[in-house]
Regions:
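A cross-family acyltransferase "interaction/gating" segment
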Residues: 107-110, 124, 157-231, 238-239, ...
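Intrinsically disordered, low-complexity terminal tails and inter-domain linkers enriched
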Residues: 56-70, 257-283
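A short, well-structured juxtamembrane/interface segment
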Residues: 34-72, 135
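Soluble extracytoplasmic domains of inner/organellar membrane proteins
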Residues: 128, 134-136, 140-145, 151-167
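Membrane-embedded segments
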Residues: 80-139, 143
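Generic beta-sheet signal
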Residues: 71-77, 99, 120, 143-149, 180-182
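A transmembrane-helix-recognition feature enriched in membrane-embedded lipid enzymes
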Residues: 1-52, 110-115
Length: 284
């Protein structure tokens, strides 16, 4: 195991200890300050440089992701890797929506559970409705909630249609919907080193990242999609996907996933081939 691997293990264990011992006593804003700093350190340990663009928030709000008195904001992001979560956290700490299977991931599953991830329980008939209620409550508190709207990962060279199920609480709350584009590169060229796709094991993905050279992740906050008037969740999902595709310089998604079942909600979509021929995997 390279030195980075040892440091990463120690960092994750420290994060679990902090979240378990301290978080129950802290307000969400203070938790998020710790999450942001911890995530930035994780990226540094992994040798991943973070670059952000377009974040239109004052530093005090960007540091916590919480804006009391506001209607909150929903981030709709493309998805390449498990490390996407920490890249977004390092830029703007958010409460993520994820499939319940993430709980079983070694160490990382416990960590993301302790920091307040909202899970969708697969196999439950009313899973999406239950999650939507919790998302609505968090938005009403002025929090930032993040969703990987493709419901699965790609290698970053394509974009899949966005699910719209989890947009319902944002529209109901009157929250802003922000498209967020993530792109990995090395020496100025698009890189697939961070991609977590197909049947790849988490350990393999981790090794690829730790041994990559000059890996950079860009997190771009794009122009919010209007949610007023007669714009429904389907319209917002398509508009967000198109803005991300344009920024990534990839073709816009083909087809639609507007009527997916509960098991196709965020992080529970079935696998689909991406443009490069690799098989996407269900998302965190």
């Amino acid at each position: 195991m390279p030195l980075r691997g040892v440091l990463l293990l120690a960092h994750v264990l420290a994060g679990i200890a902090i979240a378990a011992a301290i978080f129950p006593w802290l307000a969400q804003r203070n938790r998020n300050r710790i999450i942001r700093a911890w995530s930035g350190w994780l990226l540094s340990i992994c040798g991943v440089r973070l670059r952000t663009a377009g974040l239109p928030l004052p530093p005090a709000i960007a540091a916590t992701g919480v804006e009391p008195g506001s209607r909150g904001r929903l981030l709709l992001a493309n998805h390449v890797s498990w490390i996407d979560v920490f890249a977004i956290h390092a830029a703007l700490p958010s409460r993520f929506v994820a499939k319940s299977e993430i709980r079983s991931w070694p160490l990382l599953g416990l960590l993301v559970t302790l920091v307040g991830t909202l899970y969708i329980e697969r196999g439950r008939r009313h899973a999406v409705a239950s999650t939507n209620r919790r998302v609505f409550d968090r938005l009403q508190c002025g929090e930032t909630v993040a969703v990987f709207a493709e419901g699965t990962t790609t290698d970053g060279r394509s974009l899949l249609p966005f699910h719209s199920n989890l947009l319902a609480p944002a529209l109901e709350a009157g929250a802003e919907c922000w498209p967020v584009a993530l792109r990995y590169s090395a020496d100025g060229l698009r890189s697939t080193a961070a991609a977590f796709v197909g049947e790849m094991a988490l350990a393999t993905s981790l090794w690829n990242i730790l041994t990559a050279r000059r890996l950079q992740v860009e997190v771009a906050f794009l122009e919010p999609v209007p949610t007023t008037g007669d714009r429904g969740r389907h319209h917002v999902a398509v508009a967000a996907a198109e803005r991300i595709a344009d920024w990534l310089d990839v073709p816009p998604p083909r087809g639609r996933r507007f009527n997916g079942s509960a098991n196709q909600g965020a992080g529970t979509a079935d696998s689909a081939p991406d443009a490069a021929g690799a098989t996407a995997r269900p998302a965190p």
